[in-house]
């Protein structure tokens, strides 16, 4: 046993971490929680700053010993270090920079847009008690009350269209995976975009390489295993408040 | 002769992160200073290096790198010299968690305040037509919006209040972390400290009511310890404005 993973449905950050753990053969004790019901804020989980102030919002929590860790890309880096499966980060420093810069783009631009659109389409019913972060609590309130700003939603759809274009361009040289070899960048990009096919269909009307990439991804045993943990028919339609949209615009 | 060039502004915020990492690592580099307040970063010769027009950028041979925190990880991995990420995978995770928290939550709040009190007033006296032309040259729409807001002093009271709320909380979080550990992410000095110092070195001056020897002794200990490092002195010597000179306040003894 190498840790306890509290996770939601295999969508968004919970997907990234589950799939990374399976890719790396890390045997975690999985404790599924209902992120949409606010389980992450219950007393059953530890609440250090790294859990309560995670930039990611309602993401998974990995507890190793007395340390509770959050933020899916960095959890995947950790799993890459401790697991025995094939590497999910490039070894070359420049290739690794490319992967981390790509993930930063997804974290900062794509994830907030996807979370905003996902929550607007499937709002949570109530704001859970016990949210320590006032700004996360405000995102919950906005989501529950359907207060999404029309300008922000339009901008979010643009961000999804741009992300699909960026992936399509990245795959233009015929490569199978975003960084050449399969990596965390593939998992994190898919994690946030899987649910966007239904919500921003216009992004996918001319994206044959993205379509083939997604099919390759879904065919990976670890990805199938992660998606197979869903307890609902469409896990990509399940959203809880995620990272905030950049306050600078 | 070096094959590393860093395009940067002051040793401060994002520019200072790869600068200080290179100094700590002992990597010689060509320093290419861009005057942010003169919009050097949006001129064609720099856009040829980084089409997004963001600072900093680094070239290593024919490789071009952007995103200051990602550049720091590259500097740590690509060159010999002292290790700037902890060896333990959990500590590495913590270093990355803190850098993301600083980059995406605390730094934008500090910079909103900094832009409204420093950057905006500094460029506002320029010719309006010239300013407008300079803003039109900015490649990223998000940055155009931010510059317009800074120049026009158009951050709303709600935005400023929220930024000040986050600064207050963030100082508390930093102090709490530094009560637990000698350095921000682990028992070793590293990239999280370099990142944090670039954000926090002037806090005792800009937020004296929140950050001082009485209220935040561990932040003050941490800032003074980083200031005492030769790499920090060398790095801040590249500063050209009063912004970088604020670091001298760390010469004071604990009260």
Regions found by a protein language model. Give the residues of each.
Chain A
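Short, hydrophobic secondary-structure boundary micro-motifs
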Residues: 86-91, 114, 176-180, 224-228
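GST-like domain detector, emphasizing the conserved glutathione-binding G-site
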Residues: 1-137, 244-245
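Positions that flank functional sites
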Residues: 35-37, 182, 232-233
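GST-like fold's C-terminal all-alpha helical module
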Residues: 108-215, 219
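Residue-level recognition of oxygen-bearing side chains
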Residues: 74, 209, 222
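A generic structural-conservation signal
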Residues: 30, 206, 226-227
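Acidic/histidine-enriched, glycine/proline-rich intrinsically disordered or flexible terminal extensions
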Residues: 230-249
